[in-house]
Amino acid sequence: MSVTLPRILVNLWTQDRSISVLDCAAQMSFFLILGATECFLLAVMAYDRCVAICGPLHCPLVMTPKVCLQLAVGSWVSGIPVQTGKTCWIFSLHFCHLNETNHFFCDNPPILKLACGDTFAHAPSVCVAVLLVAAVPFILILASYSKIVCTILRLPTARRAKAFSTYSSHLLVVLLFFGSATITYLRPKSSYSAGTNRLFSLLYTIVTPMFNPMIYNLQNKDVIAALIKLLLKKVV
């Protein structure tokens, strides 16, 4: 959202929907890098919850400030070489004379449609990039939650609800992020159209990130109390 929304607002304000090739490449690069960063950060957060639930006594020893900093920095820089290389490859293609895309930001599928010739030969490099920045973090998240579920099932019934509340918000964010990304980029080609592409991209880039703060804040008792108080005032 921090990459796509500012440009959308500028376009709406100026009514100028053109963008230079350099700006388009920069927007795509930052969009891909920040997307990869979120994947790795979600994997790190899943690991943090796994340590907190499966080994609460060892959590302060495992998740030290130094380790947390290293994991955070690693999440930020891991996607840079892969996604920068992917962007350079896309913009090194030969593009046809058509330079108009029916989309509201520079995303991979609409830009690749402008390329002349067959881009299928470069599919393996794209698959490797997706595997590194999306599939690997998702597998790590599944592994963390598998261990969490196995641990919770061994807990007494009274403690299960408390343990579930520890990771429920993060699990919901993971489902929203990877679910919307899957619908946007991995749905069947027969369902592709300019209108549906824009709709799903809007869901993935703007709507889903807006829900994240709400999901995490609803785990805060003070926030819930303030929200109930506000709703009661409106009812009265």
Q: Which residue stretches match the model-derived regions?
A:
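Transmembrane helical core of 7TM receptor-like proteins
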Residues: 1-236
